């Protein structure tokens, strides 16, 4: 993964700076180890990225963050070195079941250095778009939507 993606953990934030609801004063989603954990006044990242949860029982889960957001130390921001479709990157990273690389401790966690060593095939961009299109078409069939 490390030859295709740059992975950087976010920054610590005091719990007192988090709001449970999105307001005019706290408009930015804050990503933790299992997706959005609240909203904050100031972002620490901007763009369109896969986010990997790196701490807790659900570590290895993949979310997508778009726009301005805050990533905590329990979330890994994934940037693509190659010209990759972000939706494909999210699907692909999810399919890797990254939780299998978690440390087996009381509080499971992923080390960026460990998952960076995972070898992966990368299809051409056109194939990535085709995969995403097929997934979008089939997803409602398995989610009963």
Would you name each region that the model predicts?
Residues 32-94, 103-115:
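A short beta-sheet element
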Residues 96-100, 139-141:
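A common structural junction motif
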Residues 26, 67-68, 99:
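Intrinsically disordered, low-complexity segments enriched in small/polar residues
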Residues 22-23, 43, 99:
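Generic hydrophobic-segment detector
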Residues 1-15, 20-34, 117, 121-145:
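Non-catalytic DNA-recognition/assembly elements of restriction-modification systems
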Residues 4-7, 92, 101:
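Residues that form generic nucleotide/phosphate-binding pockets
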